[in-house]
Design a protein with these regions (language model features):
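NAD(P)-dependent short-chain dehydrogenase/reductase
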Residues: 3-51, 58
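Amphipathic alpha-helical segments that line or abut small-molecule/effector binding pockets
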Residues: 57-65, 140, 144
């Protein structure tokens, strides 16, 4: 239906967005893991689901590129690399030098998730990269950006 529409349109698909905003209504994987580990809380982290996390600024940039170029179609906008959720949380712990022994490895079957989730979610970004000039940051670069933003909120 949308493809038959005569007006310019675009659909953006994304995965597991993370970032910082003032007065957030809900957290995200990075802020949740960082906060819990800083408080010394044990956290259950699944080892059997894989995602390509998207820095909020990258998602915003992708949307701006679509608007600026008056692009039409469906665009995948996410991080470039796919990691297990467990690996992401280990990277978060390493980045902020937090205690990884507080991370309890579990299977997604042990969680009462309201909706079934695919084991692996990652996108082919070629269209966004080639047509829009989209340049997603690495997860490590995203953590650096979040760290600077959080320090700005502390002032």
């Amino acid at each position: 239906l949308v493809e038959e529409c005569t007006v310019n349109w675009a659909i953006v698909r994304t995965i597991i967005v993370y970032g910082v905003v003032d007065n957030m209504s809900r957290s995200n994987l990075v802020l949740w893991a960082k906060s819990a580990l800083q408080k010394g809380e044990t956290i259950n982290v699944i080892n059997d689901q894989f995602r390509a996390p998207t820095l909020a600024e990258d998602l915003a940039e992708g949307c701006m590129l679509i608007a600026d170029k008056k692009a039409k179609g469906i665009y995948n906008i996410s991080g470039r690399d796919t990691y297990s959720i467990l690996d992401l949380v280990y990277q978060i712990a390493d980045f902020w030098q937090l205690n990884k022994s507080l991370i309890q490895v579990v299977s997604s079957t042990t969680l009462n998730q309201p909706a079934k989730r695919p084991p692996r979610t990652g996108f082919i970004l070629d269209k966004a990269i080639n047509q829009l000039g989209y340049k997603p940051k690495s997860f490590r670069e995203g953590l650096n950006i979040i760290d600077k933003q959080l320090k700005g909120f502390e002032k």
